[in-house]
Amino acid sequence: MHIKKKYWLLLPFFLLMTIFFIIPMAWIIVSGLQSEDGASISQKYEPLVSGLGFFNSFWTSLWISIVTVIVALLFSFPFCYFLSQSKNKIFKAFVISIATVPIWSSFLIKLIGLKTLLDLLIGLSLNRVGDNNLTFGSGYTLLGTIYLFTPFMFLPLYNHFCVLPKNLLLASQDLGYNWIYSFVKVVIPFSKTAMLSGIALTFFPALTSVAIAQFLDNSNQAETLGNYIFTLGNNGYDSAIERGRAAGAIIIAALITFAIYFTVVFLPKIVRIVHNKWKQHEKAF
């Protein structure tokens, strides 16, 4: 009876997942795999595969998201560790509230605020105060993704460090290891799960973000993946073929993203399992 109650508690979650994720994804897959207005599936996918627009935008988003993850991890890891070791609860609450501002404030307001600040700083340096749209280049898009998505790396690491058993570090120090060795051999392996969670929460939103490049990069030379799909979707209001191509672009991007995730997360585990079984097989003979 107790187990059945747990299943009932999971019902709202599965209901929301079905309405807002499974059904839309099923519609996207069906739209991407059916012909539109007499055009075959190959004709619908040909502009995506033969042209460089999709792959250029995917590559731009990929390197921006990878650099965002690296910068966010390098900043958040030591910061969260030392913050979790602080005994001042008021200080920790204040720092957490400041660090997580980009999460609980409006996405659009954050972009407008960052754009205004950058225009002001660049205007002061160029003696062009009052001019707008002074941000040109993918570097500003990268700056925006770092600013917006670093808190998603911060929270998993901080919550994980708060439950780090202090006796592990003390035991390492009692064995004669210095602080750096203890940090590398104890703290980093302990936080592996939190790092993977933070990487996933930072990488995928940065990869598929839409409005950041439109707001912060006025050169429009390097279109991101989110903007590319958004443009196809806008054209889809008047053309069923463009709508189908937008769905196809989402499917291709999802497959490539899944391949990256599988290579980074699951493939090392599979290799480790196969390697261990091979060792056991060799020992048996």
Swiss-Prot record:
It comes from Mycoplasma genitalium (strain ATCC 33530 / DSM 19775 / NCTC 10195 / G37) (Mycoplasmoides genitalium). This is Spermidine/putrescine transport system permease protein PotB homolog. Required for the activity of the bacterial transport system of putrescine and spermidine. The keyword Chloroplast does not apply. Signal peptide: none annotated. The keyword Membrane applies. It is found in: Cell membrane. GO terms for biological process: transmembrane transport. The chain crosses the membrane at residues 10-30, 62-82, 94-114, 136-156, 196-216, 247-267.
